[in-house]
């Protein structure tokens, strides 16, 4: 991305020169703060509500209306990305999102119900993690989703509608997983590989599915690449995240030729990340024209409130990888994946909230018609329950092209692209760094003071910060790490105006919130 000339506010670096360049008199004379006690006195708190509960929300915008679709046959619409109205929910034949999915023949033949070849582990219906995409060639909306019975036995399917809200009519199955010798005949696997290949690769000793190497066929996302080709990324735990091309004219998958050297399987496609049955799921790929990168979002941890659920992101210049993190690395099959991927959000508390957000994850993302970029995810709360709601945050790319997610749910904020006055951004911030751990720990704010002379002070730490001339870009360095991001004025979730920053470095995200005096 294009670099801007840097105006440096670092302590001890020719501050008079910086003042001439900016036309701002840098004080540098303020006393060094000594009290770093975190207090929320005088800060209004509130709960916002989306009005709906949609798990694993996948977003699509059509003519100014935003639609999200989630697990358990749920969906909602919104005009402002904040207030949502349900358009369907639950396993009923009358659910308007589908054209009688529960009564359609063959939908649950293999998985997803108590009567399937592989019955559901709890005897109920399982319809999970849909994704809706507009098929340009057919002028139709395609929903890709899964029916699932166990932690590795699943079936990717698709349905079609002429309207984004549905109803969607089931058209067929695409990919099967979790099969063994006695159930493979109920799949289409042998249409693409012979039985000897299947036994050698997919089925291991004890007549079990080779789940550590091959995927669980759930969590699909379908997208267009820079050249107009359609692709589907999918997978959860098990053998990791896989990629298959989609035939735009039919909506069906294109099975590739085997290429073992490059991780391409003739049935499941190309492995992009992970394997070894580690926590990674909910893949979502978005191509960004501004940076020229494909961004692969995934979630780590367990989706329960205290499961450490969190959002990560990798990127690549090509659609089929390699997808790498800020360190230029990616997790292999047997690596501890906590160290890999830029962590965008996990468990955190910020001022203005009545309760902490927990298990933020399984996100989608999009670039709106006005160029604003958004991340859509579900969150649980620090309230002892598993209730969840969708949230939408605006994000920006820093000067290195990495996503920086704003701290609070979007409320129509617009960043000052020409930057802010130093008096607006200097001051006392509530700062959280969620690190890279996968745990139930809730990140709590610490107090950092950004001085006008470029120094940073906190409890037992010192650092420096800087701004970029005529832009919103900023850098903060403390604890021997550098974080690059943006300043943005917005509202906290109680409606109070705040200055915020969001910056990333070393696969960590740092958020800061300053209240105006």
Predicted regions and their residues:
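N-terminal Sec-pathway targeting helices
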Residues: 1-15
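Carbohydrate-active catalytic/glycan-binding domains of CAZyme proteins
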Residues: 25-517
